[in-house]
Amino acid sequence: MKKTKRILAVVLALTLAVGTMIAFSGCSKDGDGDSTKGKTIAVVAKGESHAFWQSVKKGAEDAAAKYGYTITFRGPASESAKDLPSQMEMVQTALSNNVSGLVLATIGEGFVDMLTQAKDKNIPVVQFDSGIWANDVETLNKNSKNPIVASVATSNRMAAGVAAEKFFEDIKADIAAGDGNYVVGVIQHDETQTGIDRAGGFVDKFKELADADETTKGKYTIAQEVKPGDADNAYKAALEALFEKGAKAIFMSNEGVVKQVYDAIGAAGSKYDGIKFCGFDAGSKQIEWMRATTGPKLVGAVAQDSYQIGYNAVEQCVNAIESKTVEAEVAIAGAWWDATNVDEMIKSNLVYEG
C-alpha cells in the first residue's frame, strides 16, 4: 500500500512538474510573441460613426482578413480641435501596444513625437484620406524620422475625370444637335488645391472627350465660376452667372455647391429646368435631388470610394510589414452614382446621407 502511495506521489509530482513546464513555456511564448503578435494593424481615422468611416472600416477589415491580419479601428467623436487629444491618445495606445503597422488620418497637428516613436520602433505608417498634416510631415522629414511609407487617398483630378466621362455621355447628343454654342458651366467651390484639382480634372477630361468626337468637336464652350467659399450664397450667385451665360450643363465641384444650387432651383420655379447638372460627393440633398422626377435633372455625381481607401491603406501597410513592394502613392478614382444605383450605393456606404 505504501509502495503504491509512493508511486502515485511520484506520478503526481511528475505530472505537476510537466504541467508547470508547459505553463511557463506558454507564458514565455506570450511574452516573446504570441500568435497574434506581428499581425495587428491599428487604423486611426478622423471619425468612426459616420457612414464614410464605416465604409473605410469595412475595406480595412476585408484587406486584413485577406492577408491574415487583424485590425483595431478607432476615431474621435468629431474632426474638431476639441477631440484632437482623444485622437492623440488613440495613436499613443497603438504605439504602446507595439502594433505591426499604423494607418492614420489626423485631425490636427502635434503628432511628431508619436510618429518619431513609430520610426524608432520600425512601425510603418500609411496615411490615408486627408492624411497627416503637412507641418508634422515637414518636421519629421527635417529630423529624418518620417515613418510614412505610403499615402492612399481620392485623386480629385481622377474622380472629376470620372464625372466628366459620365456627364459627357449624357449630354453628348445635346451638344451634337445644338447650334454650335453649347455652354458647359463649372462651379469651383474654392481656390484650394482640392477645388483647383476637381475643376481642372473635369475640364481637362471633358475637353479630351468632346474634342475627340467629331459630332461634338468645336460645338461647345466651357464657362467657369470660381468662388472663395460658400459664404454669402456664393454658389447661388455662380449659378445665376452661368445661367446668364447660357449654360445648358453645369458641374458642381463639392457637396456645398450642390446644396446651395439645389436650394436655388427649388425657389426658382421652372427657371433652371433646361439645365442638366452633375455633382461631387454625396449628402441628403444630393440624394433627394437624384431621386427627383421633376425639375432640373441631376444626372449623377462622383463619390469618394471610401471602401477602396480603407482596403488599399491596409494592403500597403501589410506590404510594408512584410518587406514587399509598397506603392508610395495610391490614388483612388472615385465611384459614379446616379438614380439607377443610389440605393445600392447607400447600402454599401459609398454614398452617405447627412
Regions found by a protein language model. Name each.
Residues 1-40, 65-66, 70, 95-96, ...:
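Short, low-complexity disordered leader/linker segments with a strong preference
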Residues 40-67, 72-88, 99, 105-109, ...:
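Extracytoplasmic "Venus flytrap"
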Residues 52-67, 159-163, 194-215, 260, ...:
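Short, solvent-exposed amphipathic alpha-helices that sit
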Residues 65-82, 183, 206-232:
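Short beta-strand elements in bilobed, periplasmic/extracellular small-molecule ligand-binding domains
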Residues 87, 149-182, 232-235, 258, ...:
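Hydrophobic alpha-helical segments within soluble ligand-binding/sensing domains
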Residues 92, 104-121, 125, 202, ...:
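Hydrophobic alpha-helical
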Residues 114-158, 283-295:
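Flexible loop/hinge segments that line or gate small-molecule binding clefts
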Residues 180-189, 194-195, 206, 305-354:
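Hinge/cleft segment of the Venus flytrap/periplasmic-binding protein
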